[in-house]
Every structure is written in structure tokens, then in C-alpha cells.
Amino acid sequence: MIDCGRKFIPMSYLQDLVKIMAYYKMNTLQVHLNDNGFKQYFDNNWDKTYAAFRLESETYPGLTARDGSYSKKEFIDFQKQAATNFVEIIPEIDIPAHSLAFTHYKPEIGSKEYGMDHLDLFKPETYQFADNLFKEYLKGDDPVFVGKRVHIGTDEYSNAKKEVVEKFRAFTDHYIRLVEGFGKQAVIWGALTHAKGDTPVKSENIIMNAWYNGYADPATMIKDGYQLISIPDAMVYIVPLAGYYQDYLNEVFLYKEWTPAHIGKAVFEEKHPAILGGMFAIWNDHAGNGMSVKDIHHRVFPALQTLAVKTWTGKETSLPFEVYNEKRSAISEAPGVNQLGRIGKSPALVYERSTVAPGSTSTYPEIGYNYTVSFDITGAPEKSGTELFRSPNAVFYLADPIRGMMGFARDGYLNTFPYKVNPGEKATIQIEGDHRSTTLRVNGKVVEEMNIQKCYFNAGKDSMSYIRTLVFPLEKAGNFNSRIENLKVHNYRVSK
């Protein structure tokens, strides 16, 4: 499952991810289409809190996020192309919590009691809005939601009062039946232990993400007739830099100990007929924390490799982890896919040019972690926004657009070093990057090592980790005036 709500994930990456999944025989990708940040990072103001819905909507013009979205056509094409690779896309519209994108658009359907990220379950307008939204993507001979399953959310709504619990259960049942009315199988997040009540919720032929046993006790859910996807949060949730979940999955533990039959502390027989399989998730909880799609992939890819082994083999792994870990390093992401930006398999100087002419192109689009890029520069007057190199994913500036300093931009984030080359000045520049930092050296001295930065909110009560990494762009040189010589690219950090 990939959270595209809190951070926009470009379609090009989703397409590559499907290719990787197919290569490793993973068959289901749940695409989480809406979500929101946490209001404590936005002045404790719901109106300022980041929220997004990523799909084009003609029913509700203006609902779709302006900082990245998918047209109906490209989402349809994506699902159909994935199906040719035997990967099913399960689109998710998450209601009635995690719904700030919808209440930003239509504030009157937000809950004043439980927060504006909750829909008000007691207002008829809420149902009218959500009914029409789902119908937009379900109706017609060629619906936007192509596959046989649709996820309706139902995650983490308040259970503060019995009457709201019963309303939540009725709401869940309503949207199960709505998507079924269009011939789809409904998928829900496990919440019915947390929302324990009397109102019946359909269980026959319903799939439930079993993520936390306090929200949905898996033994009870199986007894009630639900089919489960094993996705235990403490084991298989990636929440980058958050601190309360894993930043990278504990693959040694997963490889040696976990199977889909392990849902939290509950252990079932292997290949239990009610457990359809396993899944892992990447949640982008901390909207605005500097994460790039490349950083997300750096976490996703090794997890995908290991979960592919475990979901297919269970306990019957054929190699010790140490042997598996060594051998997988030689395997590509997928034919024609290099999201990690790997160049070469052994530590080496992998690319060099005696001079870099403005506008020239490179053999490689980019180099990923770990790397060192160095060059000699003779400075000349440069306009703000002058690029050294760019790729489809990033830009490295000789003079950034704001302050005219050396720096880089990717995924909507601009990071600048406290340095610029003055006209007539000669210097040797070295940039090193790994999955946690980007370092600039000038003439052998560190100017700045951009490590993970702690940002504080609400008088220090709340904090967020901010990352400043860069998969270095190499594809095309900018239109600079300075002279660039002796470009060298190493696929390791030469200072380490």
C-alpha cells in the first residue's frame, strides 16, 4: 500500500513500481488516494493543515489537489497496464476519517466534535457528497475504477460515544453495499473491534486490512466472516522519519520470523483460508518533511524484495538471511527500471568528463545513494536560477532561484548551501550524498553537511524530522557561464 494522499507520487513512479512488483511476483498495489497531515504541524489549524485528494473529479470541480494529481484517463490506463503485468490496483478513497481534503472542499460535512479530518456521520449532506464521489468512479461501461475491488477506507474514526460507533458501523455497511452495487468487492480497514456495537456490518465476501489488533481483533473478524489481509502495523508499516513506526523495515526479523499468519501477536495456522496474504505499507504521515520519491523508493524496494519472499514461501525460505541478502544485491529492480539510480556494482569511478559544456547531455540521468560528484569550477557571473545539472527528478543549482546560492531542488523542496562561486574564483567542488544527508565541500573543507534536521512546533512540544537528500542529477547540463572541468562521479562516498 502506498500513501499518495499526504505526498504526491508521480504516475511515472507508480508505473515503475508495478513493473518491480511484477518482477518479484507481487500481485496487489493499494493506492491510497486521499489523506491529510497532522494539524499540530500547521498552527493547530485545520484550515491550514495539508490535505489532498489525487484523482480528477468532474462531479466536484476544485476538489482535486493542485500540487499533483492523476487524470481519469491516466488512472484508467495505469490500472489496465498493471493488469497486463498481473498486478491488481486497489484504489482507496478513505472515509469517514482521514477526510480533511473533502471537508476543505465542503466544510459543512466536517465534524465539529471530532475534528475536521472526520466527516460528520449525522448529516445527510455527508452521504450525498460521498455517494456521488464514489459513483463518479464506479458508474458507466468503462468506469475509472477498473478492477474488481475498491477500498472504502473506514480507518481510525472516533469511538468516543456509542451513538457515533453505531453511526460509523452503519456508514461502513452503507459504502460496502454501495460499491457492491456496481459489481465491486469492498475492501475496508479493520476497525470493528474499536467500533464494537450492535449495528450489523456486512462480512460476507468482504476483505479487511488487519493492521492493529486493538482496532480489529483478527480471530474475531475471521469468526465474523471477514477475509483478512495481514498488514500488522508494528511489523510492516514504514512511516519515514516519524519515530513511532519503522523508518526502514526490520528485514532480518521479517525474513526469519514473520509470515502472513502472524498478525501482531496473534498467530494463525500457515495458509489459513481466511487470510488472503500479506501486504506492507508506506505512510507519508509527516507531510512537509522533505521526503522525496527517491527516499520513499529507497525504503520500499528492499522491503518489497523481502516481503515477496515471505508472502510466497512463508516459513519455507530456502536460504539463510545472510546468503539471501548478499545474493539479492545482484538482482535488478526490474528490466529497464533503475529508480535507485545505481551505476556499477563495485565501488568505482563510474563517469568522468574533462569539461562540461553548457546544454550538454550525460550518459546517465542520475546517480543514487551513495555517491560523490566533484568538479573544478572557474566562476563567472550567473543569474539566479542557473542550473549545473538537471534530471527528470531533480535540479542542482550553481545559483538557486531565491538567493543565488549553490543548492538543489526536488519534489517541491529547495535546499541551499551557504556558498556561491564568485566571478573569477577557482574552486574544487565536491558533493557527497547518501540516504540521510547531502554534503558540500569546497577545496577539501566542509561547507555544510545537510543531515536530518529537527524542526520544532508549538513551543517545542511537537517536532518533525526534515530530510535533505539528493539523488544527484546528471542528465543535462544547464546554460551556465562558469567553466566546469574535471567532472568525476564515484558510486561511493570518497570521504568515508
Where are these regions (language model features)?
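Feature activates predominantly on carbohydrate-active enzymes
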Residues: 1-118, 125, 131-149, 284
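Hydrophobic faces of well-ordered beta-strands that scaffold small-molecule active sites
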Residues: 2, 29-31, 89-93, 148-152, ...
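Active-site beta-loop-alpha junctions enriched in small/polar residues
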Residues: 5, 34-38, 94-98, 155-157, ...
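Extracytoplasmic/secreted cell-surface and envelope-processing proteins
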Residues: 10, 38-41, 98-101, 160-162, ...
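Flexible, acidic glycine-rich loops studded with aromatic residues
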Residues: 20, 199-206, 213-354
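Beta-rich nucleic-acid/ligand-interaction surfaces
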Residues: 36-52, 194-201, 448, 454-457
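Active-site neighborhood of glycoside hydrolase catalytic domains
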Residues: 102-207, 211-227
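Extracellular glycan-associated modules
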Residues: 343-496
